[in-house]
Amino acid sequence: LSEKKRDEYYKIIKEKATAWAICAISHKIIDKINILNASLLGMKKSYEKLRDKGYKVTILLCDGNKTPDVDCPVEAIVKGDGKIPEIMAASILAKNHRDRLMDKADKKWPQYGFSHHKGYPTKEHYEALKNYGPCPIHRLSFRLEDKKTK
């Protein structure tokens, strides 16, 4: 989906969905427990936010092949963001939330171009890392240099 389409769907989903929750996991936690475990932790915390607000989750559908440890039925669906509308919606919410965090980071550290690459490992991002080193929000466990820019 284009960024414009995602923004449109983001607004519709937030307005029309019965319930939704987002949990951002910090770069420090990701460095400590790895990206997969951080994703599972985010799923678990998002579920707990809904449960704690009184929503009864009958099944938690997760994109991928792993599931978080939660107190409700859970199902992993590989490539679920291309198959299951609820996972598609969750994916749009998460991506837009992350993009907005990257836009805020761009205001604080404009030399990295976060609003352009949204934190993904593009040539532009690797060039910025080569020129400026990591900023306080970079995941140090991620390969911070690209073989092509060496």
Q: Language-model segments: what does each one mean?
A:
Residues 1-150:
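RNase H-like, Mg2+-dependent phosphodiesterase core
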